[in-house]
Amino acid sequence: MDNFFMTWLLPLFIVVGKTLLLLTVLLVLIAYLLYADRKIWAAVQLRRGPNVVGPWGLLQSFADLIKFVVKEPIIPSGANKGVFLLAPFVSATLALSAWAVVPVNEGWEIASINVGLLYILAISSLEVYGVIMGGWASNSKYPFLGALRSAAQMVSYEVSIGFVLVTVILVSGSLDLTTIVQEQNKGLGTYLGLPFSSLLDWNWLILFPMFIIFFISALAETNRPPFDLVEAESELVAGHMVEYSSTPYMLFFLGEYVAIVLMCALTTILFLGGWLPPLDVWWLNWVPGVIWFVLKVCFVFFWFAMVKAFVPRYRYDQLMRLGWKVFLPISLAMVVITAAILKYTSFA
């Protein structure tokens, strides 16, 4: 009995505990990032934004949650009921499951696997199926057009993201996310002999073109403006979510924001040193790594919000052209250049 407890039950309890803790923190973080998103957008437009529910409007996201849950879900008469209801669960579940391998500090992840980057790429590629299912099952032209756009958009930018990840793998020599962060302890700043140079050691500097490509591709991958063509209000009303209401709509919305925060976390891990402090000095090393990680995620999300506020939406043909004719050649060239530098110079 003791052997069964130590071999099976205890590890199971630990995994369940880690999962519940991560989900709780993640959902609370998303609630306040959504609040920040609305506040930033309001500030750019000289409005006040949410300011009624709770002090300074801090409880607005929780009020929205209650509103969505208590509303009546409406299913169109011509919809495929089973697929229609399954689609938002697929979208939200896949978005949440990608977080299983994300380390928010050294050793702080639910599952430590040596191909974590490949796992996240695979899961993020599957998320589009929830959108396609919802668009098709609604039996309406606007959701279906949104689903078709989502599929084409995902294919266009997934290739560029794949090449970006290849360059990071070449530089770090691993698919393990923890190793990728640890390898950023000895980057360009260390190579040049600069003291306290953690900020210059991170991959954003030596892979700057790929950093920009990844950031813009992440906007397209998560359907954020200026690439929100899947749910373009002026063209498709709300895209694949037109016929949804109540909890199913909330699950689509949740999956979208979980994917956005995942891309912010991935940007932090791949290019901004993960949980490493910006300067290698004792008083910054004293700060827990998870705090640095959350601050960097919030910094990346701030730029997601600013792009939404400032940049007008692309036309669909411009979006495709950017993915296939600009990002793909540049990312492919950077893979070749990075491999050549690592092979024929002493930088490796």
From Swiss-Prot:
PROSITE patterns: COMPLEX1_ND1_2. It comes from the Bacteria. It is found in: Cell inner membrane. One of its GO terms (biological process) is aerobic respiration. NDH-1 shuttles electrons from NADH, via FMN and iron-sulfur (Fe-S) centers, to quinones in the respiratory chain. The immediate electron acceptor for the enzyme in this species is believed to be ubiquinone. Couples the redox reaction to proton translocation (for every two electrons transferred, four hydrogen ions are translocated across the cytoplasmic membrane), and thus conserves the redox energy in a proton gradient. This subunit may bind ubiquinone. The keyword Oxidoreductase does not apply. Its EC number is 7.1.1.-. GO terms for molecular function: NADH dehydrogenase activity; oxidoreductase activity, acting on NAD(P)H, quinone or similar compound as acceptor; quinone binding. It is an enzyme of class 7 (translocase). Pfam families: NADHdh. This is NADH-quinone oxidoreductase subunit H. The gene is nuoH. Belongs to the complex I subunit 1 family. It is a multi-pass membrane protein. HAMAP family: NDH1_NuoH. Keywords: Cell inner membrane, Cell membrane, Membrane, NAD, Quinone, Translocase, Transmembrane, Transmembrane helix, Ubiquinone. It catalyses: a quinone + NADH + 5 H(+)(in) = a quinol + NAD(+) + 4 H(+)(out). GO terms for cellular component: plasma membrane. NDH-1 is composed of 14 different subunits. Subunits NuoA, H, J, K, L, M, N constitute the membrane sector of the complex. The chain crosses the membrane at residues 10-30, 82-102, 115-135, 161-181, 199-219, 251-271, 287-307, 322-342.
